[in-house]
């Protein structure tokens, strides 16, 4: 059996944020969510989150994930003290305890799986993850023999100058035999510079301690301040971009684009500079997104072009052109072959196949059939000051430039709305509707004014 415990009680003082450190966002997910995901493939029987600072807020945010047990650490008196809080919860548990840090979000699932696998194969009481760092300042040093048996871990602040020359560092990630660990946890002492209980001290108390050296030291980067958060964001973005490049996606200027873990791209997709993807996005084959676009929680079909536009919680069919400077808001559903042009906003509306809204229009709370041609400056006036109302436009209809459709209204199929009209009544199939003042021309007006 396997239990996973994530240390998530710290204040994160150096972040200087009202948000708990483990809830800071990184490429579309919180730090602690990424840590939990790294152990997901192991399918642990127990998942425990040790909380302290703003515990209620952390629990509220993470509870929807399901299957989490929250354990309170109050006060926060070190990593050893945190794990001591698990003793009541794991009473009678027999198996391994994997201990992860809630602020180490770049850890790959393959690394976590290798740690647990090695621990089980070696029969060790504890196996810890280690990394060799060019600059190990601030990290605990791991001392081990040639066979990988660990003799001790000494925190940086407690090291002598000679001990600090060792660059094998403790990543703060452990796989324990829980029964063995539970026996030594009560023996921890605060006899150190910080006066805290260190989980690292249990390593020297256990008969057999082994270590696994991680291949990529960036995986165990911890986050304590905004600069480190930005560094981890850059590393994770690079990892995501490289993954999708290997899957057949072209980035014209990779470092100017950002992705989230929930993105999915088809083959031969091209991403132009300054384009950003947030949340869960699906982009179909042969589409080109950007430059200067934001796609968030949206679905985009094949052979689609999106230029200098914002697409949020919307669905776009195949062979569609969007932009420049279009805004697709939540519940916009754009059918195959549509054209949404410059300075067009679409909200909570369905556009049938082949419909064109080329210029300067607002389409809100509307349903447009197939091959509708919306003239420049057409507005669906959906709000009466109290409620929103629907506009229905049938297939093959046309609206002239600068027309306003005052909802609720139903325009039939093959209907035409004259330019400059304000339409307040339903329009039948095949009808022409004109709703504007008759033009009055006064000859010689300019001369009379003089």
Curated annotation (Swiss-Prot):
Top-level taxonomy: Bacteria, Bacillati, Cyanobacteriota, Cyanophyceae, Synechococcales
Obligatory cofactor(s): Mg(2+)
Protein name, as recorded: Bifunctional protein GlmU
Catalytic residue positions: 359
N-acetyltransferase, as annotated region: 248-450
A Pfam family per the record: NTP_transf_3
Biological role: Catalyzes the last two sequential reactions in the de novo biosynthetic pathway for UDP-N-acetylglucosamine (UDP-GlcNAc). The C-terminal domain catalyzes the transfer of acetyl group from acetyl coenzyme A to glucosamine-1-phosphate (GlcN-1-P) to produce N-acetylglucosamine-1-phosphate (GlcNAc-1-P), which is converted into UDP-GlcNAc by the transfer of uridine 5-monophosphate (from uridine 5-triphosphate), a reaction catalyzed by the N-terminal domain.
Positions annotated to bind Mg(2+): 103, 224
Organism in which the protein naturally occurs: Synechococcus sp. (strain CC9605)
Keyword terms, alphabetized: Acyltransferase, Cell shape, Cell wall biogenesis/degradation, Cytoplasm, Magnesium, Metal-binding, Multifunctional enzyme, Nucleotidyltransferase, Peptidoglycan synthesis, Repeat, Transferase
